[in-house]
Design a protein with these regions (language model features):
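An N-terminal assembly and electron-transfer interface module characteristic of large anaerobic redox
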Residues: 1-238
């Protein structure tokens, strides 16, 4: 019976336990077998008994007052699942441990992976900026002889289209098309890096990059990039 109940458990994130009688031992055996979080809604003494039974053995268990309470808390569990399946592409200038731009951030990135399962891939900010260009991908300053992810003529067609759509859809735009395009190029280039590094989140030390004057040279900031990423469901921030 336990084997039958456990079928497809690899596709399940959370099991809700319901008792027709009081087979507490079966519920415990099932939870130990599948290794997945379990929960129960208000079920008289069963809620307290099952909670004690599971938690005493280090099993993840939730006891909810009602379905409304359960539904609300499951948003937290969904967020945890997303974080576990996420990989951050972090552009760094000097150190990946402490951000000069955000000293209030976490000081040990390994703790993110340890606690949430989120992985981090690092890329040199200078390599990234080199490749947000239409230059020869084999001639980038930081990686000479190694083919980069530089923008292509085909990419530019898409970038031009996105630039025009962005301007046309704006309630107000005080930037020239040329300047808007530079920020769209940055976003497009960063998304190429996200694909190449199989990442779904992005961060860069924006103020620290401003201090290098590379962004001044490139004539864009990360602001629009972060906004466009966020609109597409890609967490992105300084």
């Amino acid at each position: 019976m336990i084997d039958k109940l456990a079928e497809g458990s690899e596709e399940v994130d959370l099991y809700f336990i319901g008792y027709a009688s009081r087979p507490y031992d079966l519920a415990l055996e099932f939870a130990q077998r599948v290794g997945k979080p379990c929960a129960i809604t208000q079920a008289c003494c069963a809620s307290a008994i099952t909670s004690a039974e599971f938690l005493a053995r280090g099993l993840e268990f939730y006891s909810f007052e009602d379905w409304e309470d359960a539904t609300e808390y499951m948003t937290v569990l969904r967020a945890r699942k997303v974080m576990k399946d996420s990989k951050i592409l972090a552009a760094t200038r000097m150190t990946s441990t402490v951000s000069v731009s955000a000293p209030d951030s976490i000081i040990d990135p390994e703790k993110i992976t340890e606690r949430f399962g989120t992985r981090i891939r690092y890329v040199s900010a200078h390599e990234l900026l080199d490749q947000i260009s239409y230059d020869d991908p084999m001639e980038n300053y930081c990686t000479p002889g190694r083919k980069g992810l530089n923008l292509t003529a085909e990419d530019e067609k898409i970038i031009d289209k996105e630039t025009d759509e962005l301007i046309a859809g704006a309630e107000e735009c005080e930037m020239t098309r040329e300047m808007v395009k530079k920020s769209v190029e940055a976003n497009y280039g960063i998304q190429k890096f996200l694909d190449a590094y199989e990442s779904n989140c992005f961060t860069a030390p924006c103020p620290d990059l401003c201090a290098t004057r590379r962004l001044n040279q490139k004539q864009f900031t990360m602001c629009l990039n972060h906004s466009l990423n966020n609109e597409q469901g890609i967490p992105s921030a300084c």
